[in-house]
């Protein structure tokens, strides 16, 4: 708590204003064979996670309007694939996103990322809830630099709508993204890259 107070005093960022974030810190293990009941942890940095509701579109045609896509992303996995989309709890999906952009703060703000599903694709008895990661680059047409960040999405409404149509909750979430890989190609590829996350309510935080 003391390190949080000190961090906020030296920063314009207030941690309690963020719904989600990544905490970077430092802990020193005591040099003893006895297990300590408490561990001191010093907060070094806090990175807020952008958070939004997942988009629920009726049709593939309405998806184009509800969640525009004007550019691919590089990937949704980091650290040589060891970090990929995951469930934070039963209603929140978190994913890393890497993309290319112009090295300019105003252009950075133009990039928007939406997670969307299409109701028309859900059939009775379905077990896979498919999401599309949509990247809108705005007016940024350059690919000078590589950037990655974390994004969180509230999927509660999508889960409820899925249950209405399928008659059950999904057992698997499938995230599809158009990816350019490490090249600087801005054209949206024809095929998707897919990521899967098992949806097990009992194994996630409530």
Predicted regions and their residues:
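Short, solvent-exposed, Trp/other aromatic-anchored flexible loops in extracytoplasmic proteins
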Residues: 17-19, 137-180
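Beta-sandwich strand segments
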Residues: 32-42, 143-145, 163, 183-192
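Short helix-loop boundary/capping segments
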Residues: 77-144
């Amino acid at each position: 708590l003391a390190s949080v107070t000190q961090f906020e005093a030296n920063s314009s960022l207030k941690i309690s204003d963020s719904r989600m974030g990544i905490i970077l810190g430092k802990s020193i293990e005591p040099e003893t064979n006895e297990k300590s009941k408490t561990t001191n942890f010093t907060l070094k940095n806090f990175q807020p996670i952008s958070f939004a509701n997942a988009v629920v579109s009726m049709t593939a045609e309405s998806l184009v309007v509800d969640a525009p896509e004007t550019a691919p992303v590089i990937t949704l996995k980091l650290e040589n694939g060891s970090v990929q989309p995951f469930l934070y709890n039963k209603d929140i999906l978190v994913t890393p996103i890497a993309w290319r952009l112009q090295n300019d703060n105003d252009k950075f703000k133009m990039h928007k990322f939406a997670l969307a599903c299409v109701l028309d694709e859900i059939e009775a008895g379905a077990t896979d809830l498919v999401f599309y990661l949509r990247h809108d680059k705005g007016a940024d047409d350059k690919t000078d630099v590589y950037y990655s960040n974390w994004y969180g999405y509230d999927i509660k409404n999508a889960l409820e709508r899925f249950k209405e149509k399928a008659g059950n909750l999904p057992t698997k979430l499938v995230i599809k993204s158009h990816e350019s890989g490490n090249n600087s190609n801005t054209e949206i590829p024809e095929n998707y890259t897919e990521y899967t996350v098992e949806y097990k309510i009992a194994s996630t935080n409530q």
